[in-house]
């Protein structure tokens, strides 16, 4: 703390006090006159002269103390420095500025003791000091010898024999004294503990070698595509073909055969197709890379995104739209079938056709991959609409297809051509009505491939691939029970039931279910073709889908155009659960990860997700996933990833990700391990069904 007078110079300027006595004395001395005595001079008063504009402060203000605070900021440091950022492409201000201010610098000549240079200088000083000490010792020994010489002369004659030995000893001592002692060189330790060593590996000498291959010849080609140039090219090609034909005729028959074989192997068409195949493979890889960059945000959502809002709502979930698949060639066709590949989890097959019998045209079979949503991996076209399909479990490259005209076919994805490898015909027993569903089954006893089909003609047919031919066997013929018509001749005709859907039991190999257009569901057996095991009065309209539960062996599900979805126990003829979705149901599918979760799609464009373990009465997700005028036709769960694919009647396929609430797993309890597996899923569904079974049995 310092006084205000010294602290605030701007408030009180320097005072100029002039002593009148001293001034008069000085002037009197100069003039040589005397004014008074010395005692009178000191007693005289002194007046202070102030400038007229000086600030006058009170005593309290003068005694006020001010505190000065020293800061490390440099007042002269610039505050507006900017630098160019190449990352953002703009000038960015620099927030941190060096505050160092140098007031005084002086170059010194002091060297630190611990530095290398300081150690070397100290070593040189020790050498100089040692040499000086040795010189002093030599001079002192010389003086001593001079003093001892008289004593040596006074020695007795009898001691003459010891003179040579003494002289030799004196010479040794003189040599030792003359050679200065070299102090031991101390190893200078590096304060950074750094050691530099050369590499012990052998460096190969650099050699210049010329390239032994000749560069391919280069030619510059330029032309314009005109009508006459194209015509000339065709004429030249025709002449070449005629010349080759003439040469073949001139050859002998043996040479002709060998020439034909060689030409067959090396024809221009085959070489061109090989080049096109290689080019198509490279183009497919490039297309996938471009699509992965284009749809990177969707791929990130597919892999990592989960709806965080599910933490705050227990019984409600959402569907996140991901990729959308469509093709220009299938614009006006409906999605009639969906099926995931059992081996390649990102690949799924789509069947295109039409459900309107007045607008029947061509059909298509496309296989899409999640890695390339812009274009299908495989594309096959047919003259009739594709109504159903199924992919073999053990041979994922074989696709069984059912057509609207009643034919069934097998497509081999390994073969490049677009025609089916095997196809039925009128001679081989094709259906007379549309084929609504096909299912691969286990191979027969001779290890022949086998699949089943159901059609509106009432026949359930087993197709076996024997010697590259499709051989059919009618397993069962559907008949409407209790309804017969009499003809004038007195004969009775039994109406044929129209099969629309079927599904085989997962464990009981011979048992399967069949849904019909009349709304009935028949439990059938492969061993009995004349009668049904059981009949269920399921729906009031056509049964669109029948599906066994993947975990529980007694439970199956059905849906219909009468707006309902029903869950059944095949030992009870009445449904366990009935759900009214207020619109025609196109398809239902069980979830592969839970026995209580299933999905349904309706013609009003909505997807419904149910979880019986959370809510037995209504869906936990009702979400529109298509445009208002689009009707949803099919839905399928992925076997591993938490996504579903949905198809509509405009040829669009939409992939949707399930939120965490739609795929809840059992919660972990303290001190207990989470139980997983089919047994847990069966017990979970049994717990729900037991409550309903008791009521059904009582009634």
UniProtKB/Swiss-Prot annotation:
BP GO annotations: cilium movement; determination of left/right symmetry; epithelial cilium movement involved in extracellular fluid movement; flagellated sperm motility; heart development; insulin receptor signaling pathway; outer dynein arm assembly
Keyword Transport: no
Disulfide bond annotation, renumbered to this chain: none
InterPro entries: Dynein_IC, WD40/YVTN_repeat-like_dom_sf, WD40_repeat_dom_sf, WD40_rpt
Residues the record lists as Phosphoserine modifications: 131, 134
Predominant location category: other
Tree of life domain: Eukaryota
Phosphoprotein as UniProt keyword: yes
Entry keywords, A to Z: Cell projection, Ciliopathy, Cilium, Cilium biogenesis/degradation, Cytoplasm, Cytoskeleton, Disease variant, Dynein, Kartagener syndrome, Microtubule, Motor protein, Phosphoprotein, Primary ciliary dyskinesia, Repeat, WD repeat
Tissue expression from the record: Expressed in respiratory ciliated cells (at protein level).
WD repeat feature ranges: 320-370, 375-413, 422-465, 474-526, 531-570, 574-612, 618-658
Region annotation (Disordered) ranges: 1-54, 140-170
Compartments, record wording: Dynein axonemal particle; Cytoplasm, Cytoskeleton, Cilium axoneme
GO CC list: 9+2 motile cilium; centrosome; cilium; cytoskeleton; dynein axonemal particle; extracellular region; glial cell projection; microtubule
Signal peptide (from-to): none
Pfam family, any one: WD40
Gene Ontology MF annotations: cytoskeletal motor activity; dynein heavy chain binding; dynein light chain binding
Gene3D superfamilies named among the record's database cross-references: YVTN repeat-like/Quinoprotein amine dehydrogenase
Quaternary structure, from the entry: Consists of at least two heavy chains and a number of intermediate and light chains. Interacts with BICD2. Interacts with CFAP45 and CFAP52. Interacts with CFAP53.
Disorder: Ciliary dyskinesia, primary, 1: A disorder characterized by abnormalities of motile cilia. Respiratory infections leading to chronic inflammation and bronchiectasis are recurrent, due to defects in the respiratory cilia; reduced fertility is often observed in male patients due to abnormalities of sperm tails. Half of the patients exhibit randomization of left-right body asymmetry and situs inversus, due to dysfunction of monocilia at the embryonic node. Primary ciliary dyskinesia associated with situs inversus is referred to as Kartagener syndrome. Kartagener syndrome: An autosomal recessive disorder characterized by the association of primary ciliary dyskinesia with situs inversus. Clinical features include recurrent respiratory infections, bronchiectasis, infertility, and lateral transposition of the viscera of the thorax and abdomen. The situs inversus is most often total, although it can be partial in some cases (isolated dextrocardia or isolated transposition of abdominal viscera).
Family designation: Belongs to the dynein intermediate chain family.
Function: Part of the dynein complex of respiratory cilia.
Stated name of the protein: Dynein axonemal intermediate chain 1
Species of provenance: Homo sapiens (Human)
Gene transcribed to yield this protein: DNAI1
